[in-house]
Regions:
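Hydrophobic/aromatic beta-strand elements that line small-molecule binding cavities or substrate pockets
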Residues: 5-7, 59-64, 82-90
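Short beta-strand segments that buttress and anchor functional surface loops
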Residues: 46-53, 71-77
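Hydrophobic ligand-binding cavity/cleft-lining segments
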Residues: 1-40, 145
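A short, structured loop/turn motif at beta-sheet edges
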Residues: 13, 63-68, 87-96
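Short, charged/polar surface micro-motifs in flexible loops or helix N-caps
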Residues: 54-56, 64-70, 79
């Protein structure tokens, strides 16, 4: 089960990457995140914790990181893993941003549907919030120039 949401944001990809890299401030643009932190650099293998606005915090680990392009974090509890992939690519007038979410593990069949429902409801709001956050803090690119 994969969930994906896309949006165009009128800022360069490096602006989005800079926002993503500031993990302690994820809650400023992601209404479904109460707190996030890493115990080290924003790099593959670094562990941390993410606490959703509703629910308990879970450990997370950075599984993929390509500066200026993408990152994937994995939240986990025993026998259930939540994968959150984020990509940004250059586009006319700014950037195309995609967030993908999927679940693995022996208990994915049990926890996946409930978590998927929350993600499907929240992800469009999160993407709109990221767009507003990025464009309010950085001058949007004018595609007419």
């Amino acid at each position: 089960m994969h969930i994906e949401e896309r949006i165009h944001i009128a800022v360069p990809p490096m602006v989005i990457d800079h926002i993503w890299s500031d993990i302690d401030r994820w809650h400023l643009w992601d209404p479904d995140t109460k707190q996030a932190r890493l115990n080290g650099p924003f790099a593959v293998g670094t562990r941390g914790r993410i606490t959703p606005s509703k629910g308990m915090g879970v450990p997370m680990v950075v599984r993929e990181r390509t500066e200026g392009r993408s990152f994937t974090v994995e939240g986990y509890i025993p026998l259930f893993r939540m994968h959150f992939e984020h990509t940004v690519s250059p586009a006319v007038g700014g950037s195309d941003v995609a967030h993908r979410v999927w679940f693995t593990g022996a208990l994915a069949f049990l926890f996946g549907p409930g978590v998927a429902k929350q993600v499907r409801e929240g992800l469009p709001r999160t993407m709109r919030s990221l767009k507003a956050y990025a464009e309010q803090r950085h001058e949007p690119l004018n595609s007419d120039a």
